[in-house]
């Protein structure tokens, strides 16, 4: 972990609940193990068989829906934005998704790492490249955009 990440530390579930408005069953980040200022982060999702989406996707062979992998990436990016711009004073809106690719299925028992790297920022618009990995292997990737807005203006 580099020096900037050490300064900002990690985020356990209690910190994530302060950073993000999402709650069960839509909170898709269990922990953030590394934050490098507003440049990058690694979020963790422990996938369990008890998650509600597995009852229909698919009952005989449960696979985590790709859209939820994208949402986990967006939540990890959102935590970076919220931590940098002021916890509780702003909302982070998911704006764009480009170049999404799904490489391998994610199943119960997997530990997904969401690697999020800020590519650029212009005003209140932030762009990120995101990779989702299981056991070091790429399972999904996407470029996403987020907009930061004041809660008063939302």
Swiss-Prot record:
GO biological process: fatty acid biosynthetic process; lipid A biosynthetic process
Catalytic function, reaction form: a (3R)-hydroxyacyl-[ACP] = a (2E)-enoyl-[ACP] + H2O
EC number per UniProt: 4.2.1.59
Main subcellular location: cytoplasm
Signal peptide: none
Keywords associated with the record: Cytoplasm, Lipid A biosynthesis, Lipid biosynthesis, Lipid metabolism, Lyase
Pfam families, per the entry: FabA (PF07977)
Subcellular location: Cytoplasm
GO CC annotation, single: membrane
Single GO term (MF): (3R)-hydroxyacyl-[acyl-carrier-protein] dehydratase activity
Catalytic residue positions: 57
NCBIfam families: fabZ (TIGR01750), PRK00006.1 (NF000582)
Biological role: Involved in unsaturated fatty acids biosynthesis. Catalyzes the dehydration of short chain beta-hydroxyacyl-ACPs and long chain saturated and unsaturated beta-hydroxyacyl-ACPs.
Family: Belongs to the thioester dehydratase family. FabZ subfamily.
Protein name: 3-hydroxyacyl-[acyl-carrier-protein] dehydratase FabZ
Lineage summary: Bacteria, Pseudomonadati, Pseudomonadota, Alphaproteobacteria, Hyphomicrobiales
């Amino acid at each position: 972990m580099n020096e900037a990440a050490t300064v900002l530390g990690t985020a356990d579930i209690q910190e994530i609940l302060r950073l993000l408005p999402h709650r069960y069953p839509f909170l898709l980040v269990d922990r953030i193990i590394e934050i490098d200022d507003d440049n990058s982060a690694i979020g963790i999702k422990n996938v369990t068989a008890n998650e509600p989406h597995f009852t229909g996707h698919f009952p005989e062979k449960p696979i985590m829906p790709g859209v939820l992998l994208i949402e986990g990436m967006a939540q990890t990016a959102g935590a970076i934005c919220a931590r940098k711009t002021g916890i509780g004073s702003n909302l982070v809106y998911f704006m764009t998704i480009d170049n999404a690719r799904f490489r391998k299925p994610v199943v119960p028992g997997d530990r997904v790492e969401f690697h999020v790297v800020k590519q650029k920022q212009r005003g209140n618009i932030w762009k990120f490249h995101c990779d989702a990995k299981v056991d070091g292997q790429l399972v999904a990737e996407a470029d996403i955009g987020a907009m930061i807005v004041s809660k008063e203006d939302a």
